């Protein structure tokens, strides 16, 4: 397969494709649909790797077909694999590169023609399709590309502390909340233990007398346990 600039044997002027002194006659016999994607080529002048597009050509038939890529402006493009063969029921990728991305070529439409013919030296043309090509100007001027954005970005509100200071302010609060939770939990466990201990005059208890609590102590433990329950429910 040959690489290089696309040929201009079919499309050589600004007129409609297929007309003119060098226009090709329409295909005779069965016509094969030319399936290509994308249907139009849009090049961007600000592409980092250079303005290029990938054109995929499909062969829906059961036989191999020969293809050619023609163009109205061959000096502006380089087509890799400008002609070759497509296997049956398969596809091939054609890389097209715009080699003249200058301002005078912005928004100028060119035309490519994909021509399919039967396999062989003098195979008849069985299908052709024309697609348009256009070069778009950069989104930003070239002299501004690669420079930092001059527009200032909004900063945090005046009363908002820096992230580092905020981190150091929130960290002690988290430690305080953790220690308070542990204190409340320990107090609740002690209160429940007081409620489970027997009274001094309770008979049948196997615990020593020192672990017997009075009724007043149980009332205080029940009151503290109620307060802790309210605190946990509110949080």
Curated annotation (Swiss-Prot):
This is Motile sperm domain-containing protein 3. It is found in: Membrane. One of its GO terms (biological process) is heart development. Residues 149-164 have a biased composition (Pro residues). The keyword Transmembrane helix applies. Residues 1-25, 143-171 are annotated as: Disordered. Residues 33-145 form the MSP domain. It comes from the Eukaryota. It is a multi-pass membrane protein. Keywords: Membrane, Transmembrane, Transmembrane helix. InterPro entries: Ig-like_fold, MOSPD1/3, MSP_dom, PapD-like_sf.
């Amino acid at each position: 397969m040959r690489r290089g600039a696309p040929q201009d044997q079919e499309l050589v002027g600004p007129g409609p494709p297929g007309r003119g002194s060098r226009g090709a006659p329409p295909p005779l016999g069965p016509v094969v649909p030319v399936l290509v994607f994308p249907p139009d080529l849009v090049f961007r002048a600000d592409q980092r790797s250079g303005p290029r597009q990938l054109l995929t050509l499909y062969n829906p038939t059961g036989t191999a077909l020969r293809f050619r890529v023609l163009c109205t402006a061959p000096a502006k493009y380089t087509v890799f694999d400008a002609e070759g063969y497509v296997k049956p029921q398969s596809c091939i990728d054609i890389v097209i590169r715009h080699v003249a991305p200058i301002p005078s070529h912005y928004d100028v439409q060119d035309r490519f023609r994909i021509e399919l013919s039967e396999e062989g030296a003098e195979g008849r043309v069985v299908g052709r399709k024309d697609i348009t090509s256009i070069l778009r100007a950069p989104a930003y001027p070239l002299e501004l590309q690669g420079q930092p954005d001059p527009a200032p970005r909004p900063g945090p509100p005046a009363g908002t502390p820096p992230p580092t200071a905020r981190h150091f302010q929130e960290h002690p609060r988290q430690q305080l909340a953790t220690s308070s939770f542990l204190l409340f939990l320990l107090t609740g466990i002690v209160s429940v233990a007081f409620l489970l201990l027997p009274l001094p005059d309770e008979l049948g208890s196997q615990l020593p007398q020192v672990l017997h609590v009075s009724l007043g102590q149980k009332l205080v433990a029940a009151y503290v346990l109620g307060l802790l329950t309210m605190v946990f429910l509110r949080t």
